[in-house]
Amino acid sequence: MVKSRRSKMLARNGMFYPIIVFAAFLAFIYLTFGDLWVSSPEETLKLSFVERNGTQFYADGQVFYVNGWNSYWFMEHAVDVGRRPRVRTMLQAAAKMGLTVCRTWAFNDGAYNALQISPGKFDERVFRALDLVIAEARRHGIRLILCLVNNLKAYGGKTQYVKWAWQEGIGLSSSNDSFFYDPNIRRYFKNYVKTVLTRKNTVTGLEYRDDPTIFAWELINEPRCMTDPTGDTLQVSFDLYPHCN
């Protein structure tokens, strides 16, 4: 009798455990990816590219004013399950306040949760987080200024590019300023810019360069070349990048 009852309990448990495992799996999927779902296309605001006419910006034939702010951390938070909802909360609040443009990072080079792990090698998980940021901004009618590298060491920056070239034995100098004049480092960065421009957003289906959500591109955050205070090195370096695509 006891043996029979025990057998029934084991049988029930044998069915119960897979159900628990499956439920836990569903919970994991929801917590990990639940916030990735962006509203359906009909709920997403339609945006057109902002154009310039003289000294004035226009969108859809109307004067467009930049009321903006800086939230550099969007991609960094979007890749983290626990902090991801903060991106949506910030965009919702900004839209209610009438803000129109947000500046944020589109880079993280060689650091924790790096977008670019090494030259030309990317973490798709982090790229999808950036996809989400752009899609969420579009949903709330917010345009973005995407910055492509840091002059400072945080998030890798130009220091990381110089380090990569130096480690491969092709760097001209260990100076951080060689980012601006070393042809191998410039090649690294141009390839990075091209990859970002031609990235097809996994949420919207648009390549970044074709997405009117992106108001502008910023080549580098707080650029400075300490070895050339005239600014000539910076100017020559930047003149090369419009041809990336």
Model features per residue range: what roles?
Residues 42-245:
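Active-site mouth of glycoside hydrolases
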